[in-house]
């Protein structure tokens, strides 16, 4: 099974995370930030990954450290679960609507970190979640998982736009990690 787990404790956060790429979409997430929990749960459900997250942090400061460190840990665990990536499809893409919002995500899990995100948010927050952290979360995740993500979203409702992004990311990841043979998808023979 393609799984990973990690515990990371700093002076700002304490995070335990488990991931199973060959799961059924079971999520058990508690970060103390309701909207972020909703996004991570949605990601797991739609990617059909099993995800368990326990995260505590200095939320009395703000949610930045907790969201950032969750991105670090999820990225590292994702890289661990992918292993040498032999047989994986490597590339994934998805286009997901949510009412008036439409998100597009294309990604490559081939070991190169990069993020391009085209998104604008009208509100500074959705619930207790700063909309500035959408880009930062995906940057941190991409860097630590060593994946390239191109994403864009438009719409009127910030909740819908962010949720459409997380769902599009989920479906793109689901396609990228799918086993399609035994070889590494690279002309180099390795990633």
Curated annotation (Swiss-Prot):
Compartments (UniProt record): Cytoplasm
Catalytic activity, reaction form: D-erythro-1-(imidazol-4-yl)glycerol 3-phosphate = 3-(imidazol-4-yl)-2-oxopropyl phosphate + H2O
Main location, first listed in the record: cytoplasm
Enzyme class at the top of the EC tree: lyase
CDD domains associated with the record: IGPD (cd07914)
Keywords for this protein: Amino-acid biosynthesis, Cytoplasm, Histidine biosynthesis, Lyase
SUPFAM superfamilies, A to Z: Ribosomal protein S5 domain 2-like (SSF54211)
Record carries keyword GTP-binding: no
GO BP: any one term: L-histidine biosynthetic process
InterPro entries per record: IGPD_sf, ImidazoleglycerolP_deHydtase, ImidazoleglycerP_deHydtase_CS, Ribosomal_Su5_D2-typ_SF
Molecular function via GO: imidazoleglycerol-phosphate dehydratase activity
Pathway(s) of this molecule: Amino-acid biosynthesis; L-histidine biosynthesis; L-histidine from 5-phospho-alpha-D-ribose 1-diphosphate: step 6/9
Protein name as catalogued: Imidazoleglycerol-phosphate dehydratase
């Amino acid at each position: 099974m393609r799984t990973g787990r990690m515990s990371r404790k700093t002076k700002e956060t304490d995070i335990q995370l488990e991931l199973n790429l060959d799961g059924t979409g079971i999520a058990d997430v508690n970060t103390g930030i309701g909207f972020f929990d909703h996004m991570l749960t949605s990601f797991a459900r739609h990617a059909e990954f099993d995800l368990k997250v326990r995260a505590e942090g200095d939320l009395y400061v703000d949610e930045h450290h907790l969201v950032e460190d969750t991105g670090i840990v999820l990225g590292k665990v994702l890289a661990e679960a992918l292993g040498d990536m032999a047989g994986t499809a490597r590339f994934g893409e998805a286009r997901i609507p949510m009412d008036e919002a439409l998100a597009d995500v294309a990604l490559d899990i081939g070991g190169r970190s990069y993020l391009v995100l085209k998104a604008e948010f009208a509100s500074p927050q959705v619930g207790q979640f700063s909309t500035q952290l959408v880009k930062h979360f995906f940057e941190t995740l991409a860097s630590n998982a060593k994946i390239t993500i191109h994403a864009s979203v438009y719409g009127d409702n910030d909740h819908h736009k962010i949720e459409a992004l997380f769902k599009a990311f989920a479906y793109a990841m689901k396609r990228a990690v799918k086993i399609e043979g035994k070889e590494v998808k690279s002309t180099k023979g390795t990633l």
